[in-house]
Amino acid sequence: MQQGLTANIMDNLIAAGKAIPMIVVSANSNLPGARGGYSWEGMQNFRDELVNSIIPFVEKNFRTKSGAASRAMCGLSMGGGQSFYIGLRTPEVFSNVGLFSSGIFGGIAGGGDMDFEKEIPGMLSATGKFNASHKIFYISCGEQDPRIGPTTRAVESMRKAGVEVIFESFPGDHEWQPWRKSLHSFAQKIFR
């Protein structure tokens, strides 16, 4: 959170009235025995920790609004893959989802076309329901990031199928400059 300047970005947006006041929770999602953000199966340890421990703890100890409409999940790199799977597969928990420079669509060690319907059931077969349950679906990537090509193609495929997705690219590689800009943009869109 320090390198990402999360507190500064959020404080400035809230003070300027550009973002709704919110609590930001950053978890260590790289749990032992899990394979991070590259498959639904590989992230079950983190999903369980997030849904069954972190969210209940926050709701018990802080003044928050409960329900999916009052929650967002976003992440960068591996966290973007986790946001893709956990955020999009659990619309009853999160209705705002952001992926910043995720390698989930390829671009590091290859990667081909993703079967969106297999990975996120209902994304293509029930697009209207998918769009209604995901108020904000946001994807971003650095313009010099090797992931930009696969990400752009994935967004084009989703849009062609009727998925409502916001896509932005920012100057930079797989590093903090585009991720800070992504958070700055995403935070202004959610909870409106």
What positions do the PLM features span?
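Non-catalytic cap/lid and distal C-terminal segments of serine-dependent acyl enzymes
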Residues: 1-192
